[in-house]
Swiss-Prot record:
InterPro entries: 4pyrrol_Mease, 4pyrrol_Methylase_sf, 4pyrrole_Mease_sub1, MazG-like_dom, NTP-PPase_MazG-like_C, NTP-PPase_MazG-like_N, NTP_PyrPHydrolase_MazG, Tetrapyrrole_Mease/MazG_pred. This is Uncharacterized protein YabN. One of its GO terms (molecular function) is nucleoside triphosphate diphosphatase activity. It comes from Bacillus subtilis (strain 168). SUPFAM superfamilies: all-alpha NTP pyrophosphatases (SSF101386), Tetrapyrrole methylase (SSF53790). One of its GO terms (biological process) is dTTP catabolic process. It comes from the Bacteria.
Length: 489
């Protein structure tokens, strides 16, 4: 190869931690390249080394760290084509050092050998000062890429590069998504050096009146109190597993996919009610009840050895990616109509023509009004539809006459149901033409009836009158009062 870069770790901050060989590499280099001045060893190195090139000025040039690291790598590769390069970084070269990753990834392309000479990681000193054993479970993350979704709160958590107040504030807000505001965290600065500082603070004070620099990390002890983990999906999953386990609940253990069907339907309708009420707290509760049903079915599947919740999540994740090529691939769309058209085409391809009828994809268990709307919509896509709404109204009138004719003769229960069903089906066509969801429309009317009849009940109770003793005219008067009250409000 055309040149060589030797990467040296400066350790946690004490010159005594360096081996004789590494000390010689640092002090004998014609030019020592150092990522940053912010390290306890720099003052001593400046006394012993002929020429040091720091890269702190590169940080000032760029708004993004990625650009900083790329430029440092470019400079080092260029220098290595002229002479052997020694590059020093804090701690260990392979611990939280993006520039070292870039050097090793690009060495073949640049035709430059990259050799790592080692160095003590600050993690060793941090484990020592905190007196923790990483074998118990340990997570190490960069403050700049911290995500609440990726945190494993049952393990020791160390967040590095909490170098200023803004970064500390972002870390605090991210942790507050998962932890109580007063949860105790530990701020560790310059672990293993003479300037080592340790401070325990409640989480809400993480960015208040604390000294922070490039050598600062934050330690979050593992959560021991189970209720603090109730927001975690894994905790909920373990609760359901225990409910159906050997020492679990007799009722939960007895349930099957069939026995739970009614509860799924009930919970979904209760969720719809909460949505209609625009009641956020009620929605949270009902979404939880629906999720409970999903987890119960998944746990039954796991207990029987057929599938787990992981299979469920994997399946829907794959489906969402597959059916959104305009998001996850390079497919271009103009609007939501293109999206829906793509969705149907992809869905059809997934079915692999296994359905013998266009209508086979409409679930048989849908509520009747919703099913009617879906059946009509499917048929309309291939041209089986009315062109003008006046034709639909004519069909409604025709079905009304047929029903009236059936009633006027000696009515047969089956025929009455069939003719009345035809009226409803025709009215669903009207709703579809005007883009009305018939199930929602009827739900609104049901709710309206409930409100107005409740007004009649309450008024009668206030007046000390039994409903059974009221005339239809009296109740109709109260009904109109309720209607007028609603109109004014």
């Amino acid at each position: 190869m055309a040149g060589k870069i030797t990467v040296v770790g400066l350790g946690a901050g004490d010159m005594d931690q360096l081996t004789i060989g590494i000390h010689k590499l640092l002090t004998k280099a014609d030019t020592l390249y150092v990522r940053t001045k912010d390290h306890p060893l720099i003052e001593e190195l400046e006394k012993e080394t002929k020429n040091i090139r720091f890269f702190d000025d590169i940080y000032e040039k760029h708004d993004q760290f990625e650009a900083v690291y790329e430029e440092i790598a470019d400079i080092l590769f260029e220098a290595a084509r002229r002479e052997d390069v020694v590059y020093a970084v804090p701690g260990h070269p392979f611990v939280a050092e993006k520039t070292v990753q870039l050097l090793t990834e690009r060495q073949e392309k640049e035709n430059v050998q990259v050799k790592v000479a080692g160095g003590q990681s600050f993690l060793d000193a941090t484990f020592n000062v905190l007196q923790i054993d990483p074998i118990e479970g340990f997570q190490f993350v960069d403050a700049g890429t911290l995500s609440a979704d990726e945190l494993e709160l049952r393990h020791h958590l160390i967040i590095c590069q909490v170098y200023d107040q803004m970064t500390a504030s972002e870390v605090k807000l991210t942790l507050m998504e998962k932890l109580p505001d007063d949860y105790e965290v530990v701020i560790v600065t310059a672990a293993g050096s003479r300037g080592e500082e340790i401070r325990t603070v409640p989480l809400f004070e993480l960015d208040r009146n604390v000294a922070l620099n490039n050598l600062t990390s934050v330690y979050i002890p593992p959560i021991k109190e189970e209720k603090l983990l109730y927001h975690e999906f894994s905790t909920f999953r373990s609760i359901i597993r225990e409910l159906r386990g050997p020492n679990g609940c007799p009722w939960d253990k007895k349930q099957t996919h069939q026995s739970l069907k009614q509860y799924m339907i009930e919970e979904c309708y209760e969720l719809l009610e909460a949505i209609d009420e625009e009641d956020t707290d009620h929605m949270i509760e009902e979404l939880g009840d629906v999720l409970l049903q999903v987890l119960l079915h998944a746990q039954i599947g796991e207990d029987e050895g057929y599938f787990t919740i992981d299979d469920v999540i994997k399946g829907i994740s794959e489906k969402m990616v597959r059916r959104h090529p305009h998001v996850f691939k390079d497919v271009k769309v103009q609007d939501e109509n293109d999206v829906l058209a793509n969705w149907e085409d992809i869905k059809k391809a997934e079915k692999n023509t296994s359905e013998s009828s266009l209508l086979d994809s409409v679930p048989k268990t849908l509520p009747a009004l919703s099913k009617a709307a879906k059946l009509q919509k499917k048929a309309a896509k291939v041209g089986f539809d009315w062109e003008d709404v006046s034709d639909i109204w004519e069909k409604v009138s025709e079905e009304m006459k047929e029903f009236s004719s059936e009633v006027s003769e000696a009515p047969h229960e089956h025929n009455l149901k069939a003719e009345f069903g035809d009226i409803l089906f025709a009215l669903v066509n009207v709703a579809r033409f005007y883009k009305i969801e018939p199930e929602e429309a009827l739900t609104m009317t049901n709710d309206k009836f409930r409100r107005r009849f409740s007004y009649i009940e309450e008024t009668a109770k206030e007046e000390g009158v039994e409903l059974a003793d009221m005339s239809l005219e009296d109740m109709d008067k109260l009904w109109n009062e309720a209607k007028e009250t609603e109109r004014r409000s």
